[in-house]
């Protein structure tokens, strides 16, 4: 009989320790890791009122967001106005702004399940981030949104103005020098604002008194509150309504989901006609996400700037600063209002204008079953376009009719792109909303948001200004926003979410392998010793 040596006992204990350690890592690491991840991601505050780290980062997004505005210069304004010609456009820009956000006046519900805040935004022009060759003082020719809005209100089918009042307005627009196209500097049209004679008259006391005297006081609601006009008028140092969001305290799967916006749990019927379209789904701007992403995930989010909710789906794998990501993008279907499921997002088209007569035409379309031209007694817009029904980010009506699309009508059929000169859609440059997220934590490391703002122009015989204009939708500008998290966030994700799990993943195999090697060595030695004793 061979006695058990001390070194064998010690070796066996070490092997058992390594094996159990490796097995414990195998079984327990991911449940513990996921529990810690959820715990650290929940939004909350300390007893002294200071925010937990995750809530602090949420309130002060650690990202550099460069927003570039590309405008469209109309090169043939006279031909469009007098001959009804196809607008010829040249894209100019981008003109860069640094956008920063800060959530203020935050508070938490007594049960810790909800967080309140106001999201303040600032925009600073950044010449160094401009595309080469462009200056903030560049002049462009663009559609006169204020005048077109006035024509739509006064001469549209829903107008309450008498024929005499319409004649006076038509003459008045000409006397004020209003023209379908105007030329201003980029800084004026984007942020600084310019004085428009129509706005000045509309806000004058005499005009308001006359309108009320003749019984058109209700029409004053259509006059924009702005005294000067700019696309981003009033947005600097402003906030986009009040939010209550889910902290994930009770249900981590609802982390960041908007519970109410502007005091509303669903959008008003004045925005969208169907209950489904009015739903507020997912987190604010998609800033928070579930963990452990898969290619089958559908991630909803609410974008107050566009007055609606979207979903994003898996697009492709990628790399951001050396970290593997899954890119989730808003798919084509979300912009297709010809689909019945998106019927609530359709443009009302009360003017009943067929803006794209070549689209879905029985003489040119091979399969009419693949497109829907009309609904509810009016013409539908082709896929890739939907209306902006609120003043972006606010529970208020827009100052004039605006349509939203991906840049260069990327998601629209060729008939839309060919209806204007200068449209060159590129999926790599113009895909509307892409979130590059780290798979395990769901952290958005890079976000690219792109959208185009378009103005519908109507040939209206009752208005001198637009009597010879074509029925056309003209792009005003598109925004190309590129947000990238700061280096310390990259480092935290790299170390805590990638390196540590990878080390544990390797270590558990190494420990189990070492334990097996030790036990195998002991067994071999034991067999040899036993064989030697037997021979003797």
Swiss-Prot record:
- All ranges on the Extracellular side of the membrane: 30-502
Membrane-traversing stretches: 9-29, 503-523
Query: Keyword set for this entry?
Result: Glycoprotein, Membrane, Transmembrane, Transmembrane helix
Q: Name one GO molecular function term.
A: scavenger receptor activity
* Glycosylated residues in this chain: 73, 236, 363, 376
Coarse class of the protein's main subcellular location? membrane
Membrane topology term? Multi-pass membrane protein
Q: Where in the cell is it found?
A: Membrane
Q: Which GO terms describe its cellular component?
A: membrane
Instruction: Spell out which residues lie on the membrane's Cytoplasmic side.
Output: 1-8, 524-536
Query: What InterPro entries does the record point to?
Result: CD36_fam (IPR002159)
Q: Name one Pfam family in it.
A: CD36
Q: Which family does it belong to?
A: Belongs to the CD36 family.
**Listed name of the protein:** Uncharacterized protein R07B1.3
Q: Which organism is it from?
A: Caenorhabditis elegans
